[in-house]
Regions:
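The feature captures the conserved acid-bearing segment of alpha/beta-hydrolase catalytic domains
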Residues: 162-227, 232-233
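Short beta-strand element of the alpha/beta-hydrolase
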Residues: 26-35
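C-terminal catalytic histidine-bearing segment of alpha/beta-hydrolase fold enzymes
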Residues: 68, 229-233, 237-278
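Conserved alpha/beta-hydrolase
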Residues: 50-87
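Primarily recognizes the serine-hydrolase "nucleophile elbow" in alpha/beta-hydrolase
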Residues: 106-171
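The serine-hydrolase catalytic nucleophile loop
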Residues: 37-48, 62, 71, 226
Length: 278
């Protein structure tokens, strides 16, 4: 049985947990990002699976999370922040999530640079994965970082601008919020522009021929499968010569949660596409 090491450290100002085979040398490296309000420990279960297969998994504390918890995020969550929108809409928190995604994706890029000199890993074989907010980060990183060679996004979606605009429209339909949202139209336009600039959706067309796995829960209302199915439909003809490198797994009777079969899917995906093992 392979011996696994677990190391908690900080690299490039990012708190991480490294889960690796004890004798790791030139292994693929997979970065894992947790969900909103979570922390790096959430990736350890998957990290063990990957390490047992011969990969190194780096579980990241997202920006403003875990060991770098930010009081600005705490204020948004506990009601003490200065909100742009009515607090009950959740729109300020939802917007901040996009900033966290971008900053964390940029952190992953810096981590790849720092791991380039680590003999345990091969930064020519980089994977990225995560769930919920971490799934958004996965899409963002895959779309914007050409060094990512394989990606697996769980219970999330790639269409950040479309979803933001849909949520704004839905919130505006409530009479009790309509006037307040209308009064900050300029701020909404600025926030929409920020999200549009980072949105991975269109850029994911250029991810081909690199492998992309998308996992959804059929009953998930936090991350509706609609947006992911739409991307899958658009990418299928692009991946026509290598259909095995694109996959959408929708789990019946599953809402916004990560299950062990999902983790198994991710492990198999990276085993196949980073290690070259069927």
């Amino acid at each position: 049985m392979n011996q696994i090491t677990v190391e908690t450290t900080t690299i490039a100002d990012v708190p991480i947990i490294i889960v690796a085979p004890e004798d790791a040398e030139g292994c693929p490296i997979v970065f894992h990002v947790h969900g909103f309000t979570g922390n790096k420990k959430a990736g350890v279960a998957l990290g063990y699976r990957l390490a047992m297969e011969g990969m190194v998994c780096v579980c990241v504390d997202a920006y403003m999370h875990g060991d770098r918890l930010d009081p600005r995020l705490t204020a948004l969550l506990d009601g003490s922040a200065d909100y742009v929108y009515p607090r009950d809409t959740g729109l300020d928190i939802y917007f901040e999530l996009h900033n966290i995604v971008k900053q964390t994706g940029d952190d992953v890029e810096r981590l790849i640079d720092r791991f380039a000199g680590d003999p345990r890993v091969d930064t020519g074989r980089v994977g990225v994965t995560g769930y919920s907010m971490g799934g958004f980060t996965t899409y963002y990183t895959a779309a914007h970082n050409p060094r990512v060679q394989a990606a697996a996004a769980l219970i999330s979606f790639p269409a950040l601008t479309e979803r933001w605009e849909d949520v704004i429209a839905e919130s505006s339909s409530y009479e009790k919020w309509a006037d307040a949202i209308a009064s900050v139209e300029a701020e909404t336009a600025e926030r929409t522009a920020f999200i549009r600039a980072m949105d991975p959706y269109a850029k994911l067309r250029d991810f081909y021929p690199r492998p992309l796995l998308m996992i959804q829960g059929d009953l998930d209302t936090d991350a509706p499968k609609f947006y992911t199915v739409k991307l899958y439909r658009e990418l299928k003809p692009i991946y026509a010569e290598h259909p095995e490198r694109l996959a959408l797994h929708v789990y019946d009777h599953i809402a916004h949660q990560v299950t062990n079969p999902m983790r198994d899917d991710v492990s198999e995906w990276f085993k196949q596409h980073l290690l070259g093992k069927a």
